[in-house]
A protein has these predicted regions:
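Catalytic cores of nucleotide-sugar-dependent glycosyltransferases that transfer UDP/GDP/TDP-activated
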Residues: 1-215
Length: 215
């Protein structure tokens, strides 16, 4: 309903965007609706869409008949070249197929999702759309996230003096109830514990770490 409402609201707002930026499967039907149900209307004719994929694992899969009933989309577009994937309606696939351009979080991830290992079953589609696939590297605002004055860091440091990192390590050990040990290996990270976040790299070297460090 949200995806359809985005398009339906535009005439009431008297706003014709040049580009609609869509993000992940939750907005995957916006490019689909635009080209199948709204595209013939002159109001929408020149609107383009960019579809951003942050994680190929989350695809928004549902029963085809239920999606047809809820959305009003024509049944014939639920085929292997468009919205159907492994017998289900796939919102992520719809966004990728119908968008004018597709972006993702880095050039390396843009490559990874064209491979069987990274494509989560849609690598063939990503390979087919690679001409409009762009990897845009995620980044930080270094003015806001600066360890020299970041309000969320207990003890500040910079590239010229990193001595306070030891104090931060001690602070984190105390805050989490760990034994305070300057020599102990400590990794602090805010993340989902999945291979996609690099935890597989930790698993890859953990045996060597256990053999060479007191952890």
């Amino acid at each position: 309903y949200f995806s359809k409402a985005v398009l339906a609201a535009l005439p009431y707002m008297e706003f014709v965007p040049d580009i609609i930026q869509c993000n992940d499967w939750q907005t995957g039907l916006i490019p689909v609706f635009l080209k199948t149900m709204y595209g013939s209307d002159e109001f929408y004719r020149n609107i383009k869409t960019v579809f951003a994929v942050h994680n190929m694992k989350f695809q928004g899969r549902w029963k085809i008949n239920e999606v047809v009933d809820i959305t009003g989309l024509p049944h014939h577009i639920f085929n292997s070249n468009e919205l159907e994937s492994y017998g289900e309606a796939n919102y992520l696939k719809g966004g990728i197929v119908y968008a004018d351009a597709v972006s993702t979080v880095s050039p390396s991830y843009a490559h990874d999702i064209t491979t069987p290992e990274g494509g989560e079953g849609l690598h063939g589609l990503m390979e087919a759309r690679k001409d409009v696939l762009h990897g845009i590297l995620n980044g930080l605002d270094y003015a806001e996230y600066n360890p020299a004055d970041d309000k969320y860091i207990k003890f500040h440091f910079d590239k010229n003096d990193i001595s306070n990192k030891r104090k931060n390590k001690e602070y984190l050990q105390k805050a989490t109830g760990l034994t305070v040990d300057d020599n102990a290996l400590l990794i602090g990270i805010v993340s989902r514990m999945t291979d996609q976040k690099g935890f597989d790299l930790v698993a890859y070297v953990i045996d060597e770490i256990l053999e060479t460090m007191d952890v």
